[in-house]
Amino acid sequence: MKCAALTGISPDVIKELKAGKPRTIELQSTHNIMSIAGVKPGPDSHIFITSVDLEDLDPGDHGICVVVLAISVSMKRVMEFAHGLYFEERERMSARVQVKYCAPSIVKAVFHEGLTQPTYVEVFKTSCYHAG
């Protein structure tokens, strides 16, 4: 299955998602915002989430596959003051994505053309068996 990839996500967030409850993640990284911007939320919409950094993402890396429930991309204004002499106003783009855990996954192939292009991965869902 080919899907968008979110990289460099905290292992604690991934562990919490594996618990099964839907969670909202706020994204600040440009490459993650670009990857999520083209995704349409829905029951058939999946993304791959991993703690591996984008530069290190290779076939064989592990992560999780999640279902995208909602996406919101917005601009935030940031005011910065320095010693009362001047202030600087900046805008920062961020995205919030609500996801629900689907399955553990492994990367088969990585498709990344640059910082301003979405990152896609070909993944397969892995099975986890417990001896009883």
Question: Predicted segment positions?
Answer:
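Short coil-to-beta transition motif at edge beta-strands of beta-rich domains
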Residues: I36-L57
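Short acidic/glycine-rich loop or secondary-structure boundary segments that cap or lie
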Residues: I14-E16, D56-P59
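Contiguous surface segments at macromolecular interaction interfaces
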Residues: G63, R77-G132
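Compositionally biased, charged N-terminal/linker segments
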Residues: M1-G42
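Residues lining hydrophobic/aromatic ligand-binding pockets adjacent to catalytic sites
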Residues: M34-S35, P43, M75-F81
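Hydrophobic beta-strand residues in large extracellular and virion-surface proteins
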Residues: A4-L6, L17-G20, S45-I49, V68, ...
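Short beta-strand-centered aromatic/proline hotspots
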Residues: D58-M75
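A generic structural signal for short beta-strands and their flanking turns/coil linkers
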Residues: R23, P43-S45, H62-I64
